[in-house]
Amino acid sequence: MLSQKINKNSTWVWDIPKKFNIGKACTDAISQDGRHDQIAMIVEDEELGTSSITYKDLSIKSSQFAELLKAQGITKQSRVLVRLPNCLDYPICFLGAMKAGYISVPTSTLLTAKEIIYLARDSGAEVLVTDIKTWENLIPMLGELEFLHTVFISGEFKKKKYKNKIKVRHLGPELEKITTFTDSVNTLANDPAYLVYTSGTTGFPKGVLHAHRALLGRKPAAEFWFNFSNSSDRILHTGKFNWTYVLGSGLMDPLYMGKTVIVHEGKNEAQGWINLIKKHKATIFIGVPTIYRQILQKSNAGRNDVKTLRHCMSAGEHLSDEVFEQWHKRFGLDIYEAVGMSEFSYYISQNANMPIRPGSAGFPQPGHDIQLLDPENLRPVGLGEEGMICVPEDDPGLFLRYWNLGDETQKYRHDGWFFTGDYARYDKDGYLWFLGRKDDIIKSFGYRVSPYEIERIYKNHQEVLDCAAIGEKIGKDKILVVLYVILRQGSKITPNQLVLYGRENLASYKAPKIVYIAETFPKTKNGKILRRQIEEAISIAKSDIR
């Protein structure tokens, strides 16, 4: 395997025990080794202020929640849906449910009531943990839920009678009633642990079921992406817990390694992140490229404002060369990117042991025997050739199956591999270059063009705030490479000038033939651009140069 030469001194041997439990591993290990008073999590809430919890209290409260669930009479592997903002009750309930052998179902606070109802119905959730506002928005639609029988309300609680058979309880007081509790359920490492939802091909979200071993499957990231130190790192994450990226890098992984996590609830403000780094002496900062870009544009902070910070990480979308270079110039720190997916979390990343090549995704982390295959014949592609990223089915980080979608699971998991649908190529030095999903790759006049290569070039233009390259069909069988651009505020550049910029900086077959100016892009709840929904109707200007 090409990438192995850069990790030749870092062989990885998996040690997956027969029995393992994520809830127990994330809450109990450090509380039993003499560091039980260490802070596990700090929440900075704009309205409620600062709150924190030690590993000892996280262990106790998550065990109390586990006992509370058992008392509801639900059976092993029943689903517990968690719909909460970033707060201390989130890890208590998310991890506590897994401690008891149930399946946690994290959901976004951005979802509408109808969307929550869909997830609750699809997952068959019997228990819901949420806040009073969300609960009252759900009440008119409860007739659609045949499985839900218990609701725990976090935070403010209004005691009143509801016209349904569902039990509604105040989470805090209910936890305090639990004074004795048993050990965590002795789950198998391969038992289901949590169920995350991602965009589906049918227009409905699809559930991705992970086993308890998934936590162990991400251990290489602790060394080769997080770059954890032997001391007590303090990780500030800018995301929300519902997202797979944040559930791993901002919750489970740091807690499993005994670190302190800092999260925020409230408005996203550039200077606010600098203030939090300084206040809590954060050593690791994790975000998406948009956050890094905002800090550079909207704050005057420099290295002296974040003296404790030593490591920065990014995922979710591609980081532009411009942001990478400006961040290094301003703060003296590199930003280490990773590529992942709901089915496999982050498994390809840049690392501190190798120079970063802007535009490259880095390397598969040790232990993950990633191969680039031709999906037609399952043969590895040659150096520099385009192949689908495929994961061996026995990789401990890989998901179990799609929830209630047997055909979908079989479509992507067969012949000993999980076929990600993402394409990439290796260069001669083992660096992996991500090309995108098969559906994203633009087939134009016999060429196959990665939208990411085009976008990387245009994001370096000082007038471009964001952009998306797609294929535009003309006639029956012709496709043009076109680019949609959102300009920086006050920019006067024209679409024609942007076409010329592409011709100067890209091979002729990659350069966009048309540039559209747009004010916004259709995006997912987590901020990813929905390329399939981009069309000329969203544009406010168009190039006419030939």
Where are these regions (language model features)?
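Conserved AMP-binding/adenylation subdomain of ANL enzymes
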Residues: L216-H237, T244-T283, Q294, K298
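Conserved AMP-binding/adenylate-forming core of the ANL superfamily
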Residues: D37-C87, P91-L95, T112-I117, G172-P173
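AMP-binding/adenylate-forming catalytic domain of the ANL superfamily
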Residues: E504-I529
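AMP-binding/adenylate-forming catalytic core of the ANL superfamily
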Residues: L111, L128-T130, F285, E393, ...
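Conserved ATP/PPi-binding loop(s) of AMP-dependent carboxylate-activating enzymes
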Residues: G367, R379-K411, V449
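Gly/Ser/Thr-rich phosphate-binding loop
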Residues: H170, Y256-K259, A282-G287, L296-R357, ...
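Conserved pre-ATP/AMP-binding loop-to-beta segment of ANL
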Residues: D37-I39, L175-Y197, F204, F228-R234
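Conserved AMP-binding A3 loop
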Residues: S51-K56, N186, A193-G217
